Amino acid sequence: MTTTETLESPRAIAWRRRRQAVARTWREFTVQKGALTGLILLAVTVVMALLLPVLSDESGLDVTKADGGALNPPSARYWLGTDIDGRSVLLMTLWGARISLLVGFSATVLSVLIGTLIGITAAHFGGWTSTILMRFTDFFLVLPSLVLAIALSAVLPHGVFTVIVAIGLTAWPSTARLVRAQTLTIESRPYIERARALGGGHLHVVGKHVLPGVLPLVLANTTLVVGNAVIADATLAFLGVGDPNAVSWGAMLETALNNGAVTRGAWWNLLPPGIAIVLVVLCFTLVGRGLETVLNPRLKK
């Protein structure tokens, strides 16, 4: 221990080391150009989605107020053309980012919370608790998640909240198994035994030692789960089981297919939402892989 550390309180030392770890992680992350590019594009997309109500008028999405012709090609007035109802495809694509990202982030938070809770509980307590929770997890793993999400969306009232719940309740098993494996690794280390020998209870061991060790891996996995949630949301909307009143990228694809945009060669109704989905998922994947490379010691070698 250095002289500086002896003059600091244990809490101050812990916070300083955490700041140093965060700074080191950020430096290692920024070295990866693909991950950094993905993060920048995601930041621009999220900021644009948040500021869109200030920068644009949502009334342009109203079919009764649309003043463009049906399926007009891209022009100086409508950069990405219009849909079957005369609405601007560019405006719909921008507003669709709000719903798609909202569902993606919200469903991911729900699934990660469920998966982390089940994974830590199963690994920490072991025994019959682990057996029951893991069999429950395996049951959800063997079920087709998309089919289960469609069933939930069909049974529950249609709406954005229903889509979030349907995706969140079907996307957690992989996170649970990942967290359980990491928790078992952490709890096999000597400092966990010392904490228990000193009288540390379950909450102390999990909160002070297990959870901080699991969170970096959960963070890296979360970015990948968001991309999967965005795809699931687009799929549900495309199949017609999403929110019928919401403008999302999947709903745009579903509308284009049902209204004959494909048969009429109106590619501008298909490419913008399709490219938006691909780019957002690609960016989340790049960021997730970058974080995994930084936070997983085995991938650094």
Task: Give residue spans per PLM region.
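Hydrophobic core positions of alpha-helical segments in small-molecule transporters
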Residues: T37-L41, V103-A107, L133-F136, A149, ...
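Glycine-rich helix-loop "coupling/hinge" segments at transmembrane-helix boundaries
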Residues: L141, L152-V155, Q182-T183, V225, ...
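Gly/Trp-centered helix-boundary motif
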Residues: M1-T116, I120-T121, W128, L146, ...
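Short hydrophobic alpha-helical segments within the ABC transporter permease transmembrane module
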Residues: V89-T93, F136, V179, I192, ...
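Transmembrane alpha-helices
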Residues: R98-I114, L203-T235, F284
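Short helix-capping/hinge motifs at transmembrane helix termini and TM-loop junctions
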Residues: L52-G60, A123-G127, L152-H158, T170, ...
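Generic hydrophobic transmembrane alpha-helix motif, especially the helices
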Residues: W79-D83, V89, L110-G115, I120-R189, ...
